[in-house]
């Protein structure tokens, strides 16, 4: 398993905006998608391309097009929806799969309540979207669900990760790579990332 921290001035600046308590719901939502665009840029660096000759404005021209890669974007409801538009801006042809999980606030374990996956999961790269990788429970549950449906190419996009969550995912699924904007210090007793962003789902959707 590889963990890629996308260390770029724009990413650091935008994560700083997301950390601010004063950031409005609309700004939090838009900046989350901006960071998602930067993360997906890094996550797709390994895509292969093929050369084609097409008709350009001044005659035939050789171009490169992505080849041999079927993608499904997998937002974990509900917070993962806050990254989806940014990713789809860059990969508009991706299919959307949806996994609904919520965290039991007493046990901190994920509870599954909805699943709708794209077809041919065994042929697709699944890009899981979840703003916060905290305990790792939701991500591990989603990875296991995808693997049960035949998916073998999986990576995760997260705005912020906790070291504890990364360690759990690595132990359970060492074949899954993680792309993140930041690795924070630790989890508190309630399972929230410190310093973190707060509850990303509430901040994206304007709820408490």
Curated annotation (Swiss-Prot):
CDD domains: PRTases_typeI. Its cofactor is Mg(2+). Its EC number is 2.4.2.9. Pathway: Pyrimidine metabolism; UMP biosynthesis via salvage pathway; UMP from uracil: step 1/1. It catalyses: UMP + diphosphate = 5-phospho-alpha-D-ribose 1-diphosphate + uracil. Keywords: Allosteric enzyme, Glycosyltransferase, GTP-binding, Magnesium, Nucleotide-binding, Transferase. It is an enzyme of class 2 (transferase). 5-phospho-alpha-D-ribose 1-diphosphate binds at residues 78, 103, 130-138, 199. GO terms for biological process: UMP salvage; uracil salvage. Allosterically activated by GTP. One of its GO terms (molecular function) is GTP binding. Binds 1 Mg(2+) ion per subunit. The magnesium is bound as Mg-PRPP. Uracil binds at residues 193, 198-200. InterPro entries: PRibTrfase_dom (IPR000836), PRTase-like (IPR029057), Upp_B (IPR034332), UPRTase/APRTase (IPR050054), Ura_phspho_trans (IPR005765). Catalyzes the conversion of uracil and 5-phospho-alpha-D-ribose 1-diphosphate (PRPP) to UMP and diphosphate. Belongs to the UPRTase family. This is Uracil phosphoribosyltransferase. The lineage of its organism: Bacteria, Pseudomonadati, Thermodesulfobacteriota, Desulfovibrionia, Desulfovibrionales.
